[in-house]
Amino acid sequence: VIDRPLELRGQAGAIITGTGTGSVITVTAPDVRIEGLEITGSGTDLPAMDSAILVQQAAPRTIVRGNRLMNNLFGVYLHGAADSRVENNIIDGRQDLRLAEAGNGVSIWNAPGAAIIGNTISHGRDGIYVKISHHNRFENNTFSKLRFAIHYMYTNDSRIAGNRSRGNHVGWAIMYSERLEVEDNVSDG
């Protein structure tokens, strides 16, 4: 648990391996930066939001940048953490679970101002799943081998631009959302 503002920065080859239960890293403080790590080994409990990195409501302005999040249930879960950024990460989910049991690359719940930029996300349920969160930006991400590349639910006043979806069941699922800018995205198979 990261419970105070800090930077957790890995040197080349640094790996954090979880125990296979719970989240590997949980952030409960504002202004945390996690960068340059490989993180693996979360649990598989969907209701508990087991993630490589779980960012709680008390942790606004968290930055997750340049990491490799491999074989976790959820890659990054922004659970109420406003104005957080997830950028330039490689997120490769678990391949040993049925689709209904899999988590998302990035999940966002009630985290206004989230910026999800330049990530490569594969395997799992949805690349980015967002619910009840406004004023977000999802830009220049690449998605493959997922159910939905981007899945919007009850989320308004946001931007989806420059994303690429290849080999997913559906590219963009935009549901019950208003005032979105959706431009220059490509979905191929």
Question: Can you annotate each of these PLM segments?
Answer:
Residues 1-7, 16-61, 74-80, 108:
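Extracellular beta-strand-rich solenoid/capping regions of secreted or surface-exposed proteins
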Residues 4-6, 30-31, 60, 81-84, ...:
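Short "repeat-start/strand-capping" segments in structured domains, especially the N-termini
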Residues 12, 18-24, 43-50, 72-80, ...:
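Short glycine/acidic-rich loop motifs that flank beta-strands on beta-rich extracellular proteins
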Residues 20, 29, 57-59, 71, ...:
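A generic beta-sheet turn/junction motif
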Residues 40, 70, 92, 107, ...:
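Short beta-strand elements of solenoid repeat domains
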Residues 56-58, 66, 78, 88, ...:
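Extracellular beta-rich repeat passengers
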Residues 56-57, 66, 99-111, 145, ...:
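Short coil-to-beta transitions that initiate beta-strands within beta-rich domains
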